[in-house]
A protein has these predicted regions:
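Short, glycine-rich nucleotide/cofactor-binding loops
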Residues: 60-70
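Thr-Gly-centered strand-to-loop micro-motif
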Residues: 43, 62-64, 92
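Arginine/glycine-rich "motif VI" loop of SF2 helicases in the C-terminal RecA-like domain
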Residues: 79-87, 113-115
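Short glycine/serine/threonine-rich phosphate/pyrophosphate-binding segments
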Residues: 2-7, 68-75
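A glycine- and small-aliphatic-rich helix-loop capping segment at beta-alpha/alpha-beta transitions
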Residues: 13-15, 75-83
């Protein structure tokens, strides 16, 4: 209902679009969720909320936000990197809001803590129109074989 997500929901609703709200029980209080959602899914907690959003989503746009937004961004990047999801991730860098984070990603790659191919797991947009174009034009990054092999090995070990 509030903030940028609320603004997005109101905009979609005003144009006759469908909105799905996903909210943990603890936050499902009067005045918090957007009251005109086409569908409201109440989850047990934040972990279940993220899993539900990941399952329902075909792409992700990170708007300017706080620590919760950063945590969600890191999770979808990690899930993409490990092959658990295959979805576009667009960082909406309105007014340079995420410049420092993007510089940190570059620093991680230069220091060897992040493979340079992982920098292709997301794209950056400066306008809403560009964000939509990036979602539509999504191409999955080619990740190093060692990452793919590690995931396959872990899945085989977990299944056995």
């Amino acid at each position: 209902r509030t903030g940028l997500m609320g603004a997005c929901a109101r905009g979609v609703h005003s144009k006759g679009g469908r909105t799905v709200g996903v909210i943990p029980e603890k936050l499902n209080q009067p005045g918090i969720p957007f009251e005109h959602c086409s569908e409201m899914i109440v989850t047990k907690d934040m972990h279940e909320r993220k899993a539900t959003m990941e399952r329902l989503s075909s792409g992700f746009v990170t708007l300017p936000g706080g620590v919760g937004t950063l945590e969600e961004l890191m999770e979808v990047l990690t899930l993409n990197q490990l092959g658990y999801i295959d979805a576009p991730v667009v960082i909406f860098n309105q007014g340079g809001f995420y410049d420092n984070l993007l510089a940190q990603f570059d620093a991680l790659a230069k220091a060897g803590f992040m493979h340079t191919e992982c920098l292709k797991l997301f794209s950056v947009a400066a306008t809403p129109e560009e964000a939509i174009e990036k979602l539509i034009g999504f191409r999955k990054a080619k990740l190093p074989d060692k990452i793919k092999e590690a995931v396959k090995g872990h899945e085989a070990h977990s299944a056995g």
